[in-house]
Amino acid sequence: MNNSINHKFHHISRAEYQELLAVSRGDAVADYIIDNVSILDLINGGEISGPIVIKGRYIAGVGAEYADAPALQRIDARGATAVPGFIDAHLHIESSMMTPVTFETATLPRGLTTVICDPHEIVNVMGEAGFAWFARCAEQARQNQYLQVSSCVPALEGCDVNGASFTLEQMLAWRDHPQVTGLAEMMDYPGIISGQNALLDKLDAFRHLTLDGHCPGLGGKELNAYIAAGIENCHESYQLEEGRRKLQLGMSLMIREGSAARNLNALAPLINEFNSPQCMLCTDDRNPWEIAHEGHIDALIRRLIEQHNVPLHVAYRVASWSTARHFGLNHLGLLAPGKQADIVLLSDARKVTVQQVLVKGEPIDAQTLQAEESARLAQSAPPYGNTIDRQPVSASDFALQFTPGKRYRVIEVIHNELITHSRSSVYSENGFDRDDVCFIAVLERYGQRLAPACGLLGGFGLNEGALAATVSHDSHNIVVIGRSAEEMALAVNQVIQDGGGLCVVRNGQVQSHLPLPIAGLMSTDTAQSLAEQIDALKAAARECGPLPDEPFIQMAFLSLPVIPALKLTSQGLFDGEKFAFTTLEVTE
């Protein structure tokens, strides 16, 4: 928890203080008073009755003593329960395939008033220009969009080709930006543990801010060393005892439930009254279809309450106050005097039914957000331009030669998890000894003209066809999986033609595709249109076999070398446990 930076974010002038205090004392008129409301007490449990009094961006007072206070406008909450605005502790907005402007339109009416975003997806493609665009979006947003400065671009040096670098000098230029809360996830945990100076330089430069971690499955002395370096949190835990040990060692735990990585069921039993200040909720990567149909952080709160019997005040605590404290955002996370008036009114607190949202003291209207979306997007000056520097491919580019009797490594997918297993399969004249083995390839898209890196994939469920995408963490090269080289080539050529995007091929034809014109990562369509297109893509993909719930998000992590156990980058097969490249053929 980093309270030393609170002054940076709590922008309030002396004149604003005087006006706020006058309303608190009852000597001046409030801007808004919310009547007929109960406030969920996140500290003690239970509820506080009485109005919420707002002046400007801030709460001037709470409680029955303000029942007769004057206001310019009164809001009748109709018996609703008021809770602080929800906070996502760690996400990559790009993974929603929405721009930050569209993301705000889709999630703010659901109560998501604050996000802590690491824009390392677009930074890996476009470098500092991508970070600058996210900062512009954050500056103009109604939603509190805070940024962690991307620390690992690329994710792991020398393991992949990406589109740009983001040097320490460039990082430092953004450190004091008003929307920056700290240093984003330090994914090269072996480098931190071994004391590599280049990585320690980054930690030292941001040590007065919040230092995000990334250490899936880490334990023992290595975990102790990683925490000793100053890392404060982790969102990659996927086992109960792993999460418990990190909490015991003083690390804050971000409980993640995204579209591919689903760790809430495994980790929710850890949450209790004692450790909840050290627990937070995050999505990491969540697609627009799930946001539209299930929700965002509101969906996670609902599951904590309904499926895991977490008390109301604890569930809402980990969705707001705990995260605000961790990042030094002490003006957020509570409905109390002097706090920013980010308020969610719930007609049903157990079902997280959002009735109305206020952010920075102003009611939010979903229709107004939608009507203003295109103008606000244009104002942010998105970095348009084709980022795909790759010539069309042919089936021969994916030709692999196998020798009967030999054993070959297979990337084994675990549905709804980002980790994979390293398996092997024996080849014979009739094919592999497992019928679920298909092909995977990664093609760099930044003009280096490398031959595709090819491998084998098991457990994905692809019985026919091919899927291709330019969303491929973290370097975002082209990843394609398929049953035939011809269909793989067709899918790849479609995303090249689109300037980036997603594609499904079956029966020798493109069944569905989605162009992503911003960095090959994001669409400029509305959230509703994007959700409909994702629905069509998923329907087409389901015709190819019993795939993961979110096949494109699951596929996007098959190239990320910092998550074990076996991955494929543009440079070849990578052993994520030994942190070294390995061969397709098993020779040991």
From Swiss-Prot:
Its protein name is Adenine deaminase
Which GO MF terms are attached to this record? adenine deaminase activity
The cofactor named in the record is: Mn(2+)
Say if the entry is tagged with keyword Hydrolase: yes
Which gene name does the record give? Answer: ade
Q: Catalysed reaction(s)?
A: adenine + H2O + H(+) = hypoxanthine + NH4(+)
Q: What class of enzyme is it?
A: hydrolase
- TM spans, by residue? none
From the UniProt record, give one GO term of the biological process aspect: adenine catabolic process
Q: Which family does it belong to?
A: Belongs to the metallo-dependent hydrolases superfamily. Adenine deaminase family.
